[in-house]
């Protein structure tokens, strides 16, 4: 597997290139805010784009989609989770050469948030960061995100976590690391504790020296 994390500008955004080494077909995840950096990586790896995937619809993840429209080598690029007519179901899979992309619906940060699992890697968008979780608006969204994060935590502890922004101390981590170190994940047994941290996060960060 070819797997590339791409620093794509904006608010420390990450885009991703996932490709089959057998067919050189590629999936691009969140090609924004600077799609040219993604295009450069596609050229460098000499791959053919098959899928454009958005982890969610926020502009800083989806604005570059239109740079990848049209047909390449006689085949249309397939857009996934890029609007109402491209919705992917929870647990649905797609083939990418010898690779299987598995989609996990993780609403909370947004209603359309998804994570993508391929082999031992999990691209989490704005659902889960290194040491942090995605922002939510109000108690109801926080509850939905709480349930989504619990769904992710049943994955094997060595599953690699690849987030949508560089908000942590490292560019990636693992499910096991997050279970032991992420203050939000450590509060997934009780929603009231998770919600408390959501509501008091600025103060908590200051008291614990978290950037």
Show which residues each predicted segment covers.
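Histidine-centered catalytic micro-motifs
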Residues: 52-62, 104-112, 162-168
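Active-site metal-binding loops of divalent metal-dependent hydrolases
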Residues: 31-33, 57, 108-110, 120-121, ...
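Structural motif
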Residues: 15, 26, 101, 113, ...
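Active-site HxH/HxHxD metal-binding segment of metal-dependent hydrolases
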Residues: 11-12, 23-26, 31-102, 180-184, ...
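Conserved beta-strand hairpin/beta-sheet module of binuclear metal-dependent hydrolase folds
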Residues: 1-45, 115-125, 131
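Core dinuclear metal-dependent hydrolase active-site scaffold
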Residues: 17, 91-118, 122
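Accessory terminal helices/loops
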Residues: 2, 147-211
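Charged helix-capping and loop-helix junction motifs
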Residues: 139-149
């Amino acid at each position: 597997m070819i797997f590339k994390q791409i620093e794509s500008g904006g608010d420390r955004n990450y885009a991703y290139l996932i490709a089959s080494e057998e067919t050189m077909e590629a999936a691009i995840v969140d090609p924004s805010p600077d799609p040219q950096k993604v295009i450069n990586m596609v050229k460098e790896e000499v791959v053919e784009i098959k899928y454009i995937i958005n982890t969610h619809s926020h502009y800083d993840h989806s604005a570059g989609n239109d740079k990848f429209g049209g047909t390449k080598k006689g085949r249309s690029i397939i857009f996934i989770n890029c609007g109402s007519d491209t919705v992917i179901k929870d647990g649905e899979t797609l083939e990418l050469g010898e690779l299987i992309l598995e989609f996990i619906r993780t609403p909370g940060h947004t209603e359309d948030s998804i994570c993508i699992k391929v082999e031992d890697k999990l691209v989490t968008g704005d659902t889960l960061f290194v040491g942090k979780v995605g922002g939510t608006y109000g108690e109801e969204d926080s509850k939905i995100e709480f349930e989504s994060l619990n769904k992710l935590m049943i994955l094997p502890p060595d599953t690699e976590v690849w987030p949508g922004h560089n908000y942590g101390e490292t560019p990636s981590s693992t499910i096991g690391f997050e279970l032991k170190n992420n203050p939000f994940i450590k509060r997934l047994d009780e929603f009231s504790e998770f919600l408390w941290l959501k509501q008091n996060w600025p103060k908590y960060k200051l008291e614990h020296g978290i950037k």
